Structure formats: structure tokens, C-alpha cells
Amino acid sequence: LRSLLGGGFRESGQEEYSKIEMPSIPRKFARVHLTHDIDCPYEYHGVRSLFRAYVKEHKSLWNAYQLAFRSLLSDRYFTFDRFLEWNREVERRLPKGKCKTLFFYKTPSKEPEDRPNYRVTHGAARRVHLYARKYGVEEAFHIPMEGSLHPERIEHQLHLLEHDLKKSITHARYHYLAAREP
């Protein structure tokens, strides 16, 4: 910041920049937030995944069936138990209260960018929610693309997630800033 201000003052012909005192900022983190977006909690799960694997990915019917209806723990996208163990190790190494884990859930939407659609109370997302409760993870709102295109729907989506989680939400994340003005 000092070099930026100094350069600006030098360009304007003023040499007053040396009188500006910048406070020294200690180089340490106040808090560490370990965040995970629950965008796609599974690779294959259910009937739609069966058809996707068979039709779009040209897998054999038997292979597609096995992928779609296997245990979630053997799905390569369902890695939350491992992540939470790693997070726990990080939390142990930091002072108490300086580190927390957050899961950001989406709400169902009609936009293709928001797929797959899921509710926290059903299927694989419910399993993620149970892990969050078991490990003391704070759950938060991941604003979907539909919220960018129709900001008036964000409040409804937030209430839907709060209803599903049965608690109020205090954190939100938004990835689609390029789509609309923040």
C-alpha cells in the first residue's frame, strides 16, 4: 500500500507521501475456516446416474447399475469422511477456537449450472448432513446460479435450506459474481 500511495503522490508531483505512517500488521491468522462446497456430493447415485452412465458415458448396463446403486462410501466423489478427519487434525494443531469447518449447501434450482439438484434431507446430501452433525461442522448457504439471475429468489432459497437444516444460517458463499453485479 505504501508503494502504491507513494507512486501516486510522486506522479502528482507531491513529495508528502513520506509523512504517511502505515500501521504494522502482525503476520498471523486470526481464524482458519476449512470450507467445503457440497456442489456434487456423489458421482453416481440413483436412477438418473444409471441412465447417464449407460447412455451418455456408454458404460455397460451392468457397470452402470453397479455404479448407480453401490454404497456411497465407495463413490469417488463422496470423500467427506476423509476430509473431516483431515480437518480434525488441522484443528488439533491450532489453538482452540481458531479453526472451524464449514459445509456450503446449495438449494434446488432450474439452472443447468446448479445441477445436480438435491435437498439436504434426502439421499447422499442427508449423509453429508449427518457427517456434519457428527463432526460439529457449521453448515452454510451456497447461493446457486439462479440467485444470480433472480436475486429476489435468494431469500426463498435461504428459507428452504434453513427449513431443511432446522436452524438459522449465518454464513453464505457466492461463486457467480461474474454473472451479475455483487
Q: Across the structure, where does each feature detected by a protein language model lie?
A:
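Terminal accessory/targeting
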Residues: 1-120
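Conserved, mostly hydrophobic/aromatic
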Residues: 37, 142, 172
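Acidic, His- and aromatic-enriched active-site or binding-groove loops in soluble protein domains
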Residues: 54-58, 120-142, 164-168
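Short alpha-helix boundary/capping motifs
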Residues: 77, 122, 176-178
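Conserved radical SAM core fold
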Residues: 107-112, 139-148
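Catalytic domains of cell-wall/extracellular-matrix polysaccharide-remodeling enzymes
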Residues: 145-182
